[in-house]
Amino acid sequence: KIDNFKNYDISGSIESVIDNCDLVIDASPGGNGFVNKKNIYEPNGIKAIFQGGETIFNDKSVADILFNSRVNYAEAFDKNYVMQGSCNVTGMGRILNPLREKYSDKLSRFDATLIRRWADLEQTDKQTVDTIEMTEQPHHGTDVKAYFGKDAPLFVRAIKVPTKQMHLHIM
């Protein structure tokens, strides 16, 4: 990819760019956001928003809150570090929260089945395997419970199918 920039004069460092920022939107590959937070953002007092490839759990946590505009918009205002959930986690929150608001006294549980593509379009190095794979308790349920509460009656299954075209939620 460096060849794509051969006609440009590039100078400075990531730190010199960060010096002029109030907020960084970190879209680096999963796991790198935590390293960036510890090595760059925290030491320089820079706020950051992280992508869904990171985590808010355990010792690799990048943020205090998993953000979903339909669920916890106002709570994110004072946070220095926020994580935007994956597309599946965000979609579930946007669909389920209005149902919770309108029918909370009538709902006993939420069941969701995610039918997921095997690999994202840009993952050209990741082979689309001709098989179907089911995950009984994928991270999506735990992530959604981060903003609904750990005792939310949410039960999620994920099924990977051999395609790169879509995700589908059955709720």
Language-model features and meaning:
Residues 96-170:
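Active-site-lining helix/loop region of Rossmann-like oxidoreductase modules
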